[in-house]
Amino acid sequence: MNTSPGTVGSDPVILATAGYDHTVRFWQAHSGICTRTVQHQDSQVNALEITPDRTMIAAAGYQHIRMYDLNSNNPNPIISYDGVNKNVASVGFHEDGRWMYTGGEDCTARIWDLRSRNLQCQRIFQVNAPINCVCLHPNQAELIVGDQSGAIHIWDLKTDHNEQLIPEPEVSITSAHIDPDASYMAAVNSTGNCYVWNLTGGIGDEVTQLIPKTKIPAHTRYALQCRFSPDSTLLATCSADQTCKIWRTSNFSLMTELSIKSSNPGESSRGWMWGCAFSGDSQYIVTASSDNLARLWCVETGEIKREYGGHQKAVVCLAFNDSVLG
């Protein structure tokens, strides 16, 4: 892997944030210093993801996907794709970086071949409602797709077969995630509920089976994201209620509430907690919120360790990678 000294890709910790001010910002996680700003002219950024080899970052926006180089300070995207209708809401990668997946308001999830320099859409999965989220099963063979009609689709990439489940009809699924051990799947929705399933199967030719585990009334307002920790012991949920809540997966009890609510009764809402990402050791979490800040928190104590200030508008997505490649 060729990384130039002084580039984002040369840092063992990559933290990037983006949102409504049409910039992607890169931060030195421990100091809070912004080390690079990329102008993302065409629209807001809805989702960010770092490639598994840490060479590029994908930014999903309105009717496009842009990929920026992490190993140079090139301000321009090195790969662009503009052939998608409406907002691209979700983006991620196969673990070997062979393909990328996206989902969006055009009611499609797509798989893109990354082996050629021009993005080729290889496969399309069509649903009947705008897609809010797509996540990849750790087996790399099934995509979980959540849509605004309340449906969760499990798309088996090997057979092209799909199953669907609807936890609450007509209540939009905003985020879904499977823990690294493939023991649980969680999904949150626009009423603030979080559903958790036990997973079985999903090995070899077996299709993943979902067994309902629990329903958590996690938030009283819109929930925006759910993420399991790398060690599978924690689940984080983010919401429009200005909190990110950390739940223990041993019994799905609340461990910590991270809040950006003001202690000053006269101050209005600081806005939504849009997204989060755990550190590799599961001890810390970074959040993105619409008060223009990202924050680094200690998971156990709920203490804010660092604030990342510089965005001029809401921060709605982030990407965090502190795993050092061997």
Swiss-Prot record:
PTM N-acetylmethionine: at which residues? Answer: M1
Record carries keyword Calcium: no
Example GO BP = TORC2 signaling
- WD repeats, residue ranges: 1-37, 40-80, 83-122, 126-165, 168-207, 218-257, 268-309
UniProt-listed SUPFAM superfamilies? Quinoprotein alcohol dehydrogenase-like
Question: What GO terms fall under cellular component here?
Answer: cytoplasm; lysosomal membrane; TORC1 complex; TORC2 complex
The cross-link Glycyl lysine isopeptide (Lys-Gly) (interchain with G-Cter in SUMO3) sits at: K86, K215, K245, K261, K305
**Cross-link Glycyl lysine isopeptide (Lys-Gly) (interchain with G-Cter in SUMO1) - where?**
K313
Modified residues annotated as Phosphothreonine in this record: T51
Kindly provide the PTM information from the record. Answer: Phosphorylation at Thr-51 by CDK1 promotes ubiquitination by the SCF(FBXW7) complex, followed by degradation.
Q: Which residues form a coiled coil?
A: none
Leader sequence residues? none
Which coarse location class describes where this protein primarily resides?
Answer: membrane
Repeat listed as a keyword: yes
Describe the protein's quaternary organization and the partners it interacts with: Part of the mechanistic target of rapamycin complex 1 (mTORC1) which contains MTOR, MLST8 and RPTOR. mTORC1 associates with AKT1S1/PRAS40, which inhibits its activity. mTORC1 binds to and is inhibited by FKBP12-rapamycin. Within mTORC1, interacts directly with MTOR and RPTOR. Component of the mechanistic target of rapamycin complex 2 (mTORC2), consisting in two heterotretramers composed of MTOR, MLST8, RICTOR and MAPKAP1/SIN1. Contrary to mTORC1, mTORC2 does not bind to and is not sensitive to FKBP12-rapamycin. mTORC1 and mTORC2 associate with DEPTOR, which regulates their activity.
Q: What does this protein do?
A: Subunit of both mTORC1 and mTORC2, which regulates cell growth and survival in response to nutrient and hormonal signals. mTORC1 is activated in response to growth factors or amino acids. In response to nutrients, mTORC1 is recruited to the lysosome membrane and promotes protein, lipid and nucleotide synthesis by phosphorylating several substrates, such as ribosomal protein S6 kinase (RPS6KB1 and RPS6KB2) and EIF4EBP1 (4E-BP1).
Q: Which family would the database say this protein is a member of? A: Belongs to the WD repeat LST8 family.
The name this protein carries in UniProt is Target of rapamycin complex subunit LST8
Q: Which organism is it from?
A: Bos taurus
Gene behind the chain: MLST8
